[in-house]
Amino acid sequence: MHKLVSQLVIYRNLPADNLLEPLAEICAEFAAGDYNREELTAEIYEQVHKLLDIGTVYGFDKNLWHNYLAFLLVSCENPFAITCEKVGACEGSVNRFAKHDFKIFQQLFTYDFSELERALGINCFSLISNYQAVVKQERRYNKNISEKVQALSAALEKAADADEFFACVTKFYHDYGVGKLGLNKAFRIAQAQQGEPELVPISNTEQITFADLIGYEDQKQRLLENTEAFVAGRPANNVLLFGDSGTGKSSSIKALINKYYDQGLRMIEIYKHQFRDLSQVIAQIKNRNYRFIIYMDDLSFEEFEIEYKYLKAIIEGGLEVRPDNILIYATSNRRHLINETWKDRNDVTQEDGIYKSDTMQEKLSLVNRFGCTIYYGQPTQKEYYKIVCELAKKQGLELADDFLCAEARKWELHHGGISGRTAQQFINYLQGVADFSKK
């Protein structure tokens, strides 16, 4: 195995925590014959333990060794893989190097650990090659990754030669991409040890769809039209969803990533205090072959906050042009985002050479940089009742509409007023607490 791994070219720079290189070193030590049996066995168990951890995190099953090799192939963000993401393989000499590496991976797929097991009196490699995972009834956060990697693993097992292996891997890159950007829908920003922003996958995204959002058809249509244009590579605008709380603004944004993930849409959630990192985040993603929505939830600024200046420069106004594969979508309960004061409205007062009206115009100019603004207003009483009844049907609650409306009226009086959120909370209450089986 050590000889095989040492001959890799394109896939040479494996992740620092990979298991392939340590296992290759173990096999080399065994082949040389100069080893301590107990120490070598302990080293093997250490790597198998890590493999079991990975299998548990991602829900791998059957052949964990094959699953892991497939996982390595879809995780390595090398130049070849990145050029293939969302477009597939292109003609070029690099394909010969790729097929060279894939021939090695195909040999690793069929690597025989039996001699090692017999000599050390172990059977762990046989066990991980015929592994039966414990079925989890609870929600699996990495189900999306698990299903894709296992499907690729099964396809690679059937590949007859390096050409078929090449076709399977590059098709995966075409369909989903590579690395964390290819395997995950959404990300948050964290500070790496070096102090630079790092994209961290969000594994437990909400599985909401537009069919789950009752009402607001015009608003959803405008949002979909803009996003479809963006995903298709046509001109599109930054979007601001504003209006009353609990009306489905954030849910509409979340539904987008579930609808368009397979078409290359990715979402990055960012908070106000991270706006100064926006330029560095954009630098990391601008050359990747995906469409990115930078998502800002509940966006608003108080008079003393200046983070909006970073946002203005990124949206429009800085020297560097915003890349075509990036848009900013924000939600807010405020129409103008930045809190105004009466001093801002004073056209006469001057302080330090700056007219207060100029200050107000600077603040108001932020919202004007969102080319698409969509208003989500509070539903009427009739619309609220319709939302309640539709949600009840979706959840299989067989209750009369009159009864639902009467109870929903009582509920909203004590739970924040009329809104889609209030309706959903009422349905949650009916499902989880109340016993209306005789109604």
What are these regions (language model features)?
Residues E302-D352:
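Conserved catalytic/switch belt of AAA+ P-loop NTPases
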Residues M1-E157:
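Intrinsically disordered, low-complexity N-terminal extensions of AAA+/P-loop NTPases
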Residues I202-E228:
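N-terminal pre-Walker A segment at the start of P-loop NTPase domains
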Residues K259-F292, L299-F304:
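AAA+/P-loop NTPase substrate/partner-engagement loops
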Residues R234-I253:
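Walker A/P-loop nucleotide-binding motif
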Residues T349-L364, G371-Y385:
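Conserved AAA+ ATPase "SRH/arginine-finger" region at the nucleotide-binding site
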Residues T373, G377-K439:
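C-terminal alpha-helical "lid" subdomain
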